[in-house]
């Protein structure tokens, strides 16, 4: 297999640096580009400087140049940035791995439509563990569909800008689908004041922000006399980076299509 030429968007950020480190360590991948936001003080620096390495790849804000030199773009940025990168990827036939969260439904529709022209994987969480957890939740939701209240509690670092997290929403969507509903029909986001008794048909969400928490997610099935908790905790972003590389390898066998990590891992 030839080496995958991979570019990283948001290259100077926490996740971007982890992705660069993972690409440099992968025997089947080459760092082909490092994209950063316009105005970033890191522009022009070597992408491996934070590791004390010289990669020969400088941080740039030129998406056209990056896409001209890469075959894959891994993007964990923000929705507006990802959509701009998507346009360039379509022009240059670059395959996309998208871990960005916070998309609106119309924006998600744009990503799905792009799958008709290029190959892309979109997932709110690239971790293998989280995606196996989704299968556990699908099974549990069917068993606890009656007589159990469902709550999703997530915690992230103080810098996270969207809530609930994309992973929490993905968990809610999985549970809702397993019980024949849509999340829009049953989600309750936070509670305040006199809320009245809990509607047993709802799925509740609570979000915690603080410190350097990488990502904790717990789904609580609360019945009478017992509680079942399914929890996933991320100790570092390494699992996200390794999952993103796994997604890129999966895309090597596809010219077009819209996929998620369930497809990548063969969990469907």
From Swiss-Prot:
Name of the molecule in the record: 4-hydroxy-tetrahydrodipicolinate reductase
Where, subcellularly, is it found?
Cytoplasm
* Gene field: dapB
Please give the catalytic activity noted in the UniProt record: (S)-2,3,4,5-tetrahydrodipicolinate + NAD(+) + H2O = (2S,4S)-4-hydroxy-2,3,4,5-tetrahydrodipicolinate + NADH + H(+); (S)-2,3,4,5-tetrahydrodipicolinate + NADP(+) + H2O = (2S,4S)-4-hydroxy-2,3,4,5-tetrahydrodipicolinate + NADPH + H(+)
EC numbers listed for it are 1.17.1.8
One GO term of the biological process aspect: diaminopimelate biosynthetic process
Top-level division of the source organism's lineage: Bacteria
- Residues that hold NADP(+) according to the record: 37
Pfam families according to UniProt: DapB_C, DapB_N
NCBIfam families registered for this protein in UniProt: dapB
For this UniProt record, give its keywords in alphabetical order, as a comma-separated list. Amino-acid biosynthesis, Cytoplasm, Diaminopimelate biosynthesis, Lysine biosynthesis, NAD, NADP, Oxidoreductase
Q: Which residues does the entry assign to the active site, renumbered to this chain?
A: 156, 160
Protein's pathway: Amino-acid biosynthesis; L-lysine biosynthesis via DAP pathway; (S)-tetrahydrodipicolinate from L-aspartate: step 4/4
A Gene Ontology molecular function term of the record:
oxidoreductase activity, acting on CH or CH2 groups, NAD or NADP as acceptor
Organism per entry:
Burkholderia pseudomallei (strain K96243)
Upper taxonomic lineage: Bacteria, Pseudomonadati, Pseudomonadota, Betaproteobacteria, Burkholderiales
Describe the family membership recorded for this protein in Swiss-Prot or TrEMBL. Answer: Belongs to the DapB family.
Known InterPro entries for this protein? DapB_C, DapB_N, DapB_N_CS, DHDPR_bac, NAD(P)-bd_dom_sf
This chain's function reads:
Catalyzes the conversion of 4-hydroxy-tetrahydrodipicolinate (HTPA) to tetrahydrodipicolinate.
**One cellular component (GO) term of this entry:** cytosol
